[in-house]
UniProtKB/Swiss-Prot annotation:
Protein known as: Antitoxin LsoB
Function statement: Antitoxin component of a type II toxin-antitoxin (TA) system. A labile antitoxin (half-life of 5.9 minutes) that inhibits the endonuclease activity of cognate toxin LsoA but not that of non-cognate toxin RnlA.
Subunit-level organization: Can form a complex with cognate toxin LsoA.
Transmembrane segments: none
UniProt keyword list: Plasmid, Toxin-antitoxin system
InterPro entries from the UniProt entry: RnlB/LsoB_antitoxin (IPR031834)
Other notes: This plasmid is only found in Sakai-derived strains of E.coli O157.
Superkingdom as given in the UniProt entry: Bacteria
Amino acid sequence: MKKDKKYQIEAIKNKDKTLFIVYATDIYSPSEFFSKIESDLKKKKSKGDVFFDLIIPNGGKKDRYVYTSFNGEKFSSYTLNKVTKTDEYNDLSELSASFFKKNFDKINVNLLSKATSFALKKGIPI
């Protein structure tokens, strides 16, 4: 992943469907890049739920995960819904912890507290 890329997409196969996580890696929200993200997802030739991890642009856990669906061509809605289920949040947090630990040197942590930055660097789910 290039340092100047504002987001990274991870595709996870879950039984018969695909789950996508779009990690914001800079202070910009991925919603600013919806058309580019749609184009990137279309290249993956799959459809599924798309979760956005906004810990970097939000500066913390508040409203960290939001989601929509992708039908293989475009987002089903440009209105993002908050993840409110605890189990779903915890599962996403585990996946995110692994991603940020592996890619810590490529993210912008300027908006994060030292504690949050440390947790991401060490791969601790938060």
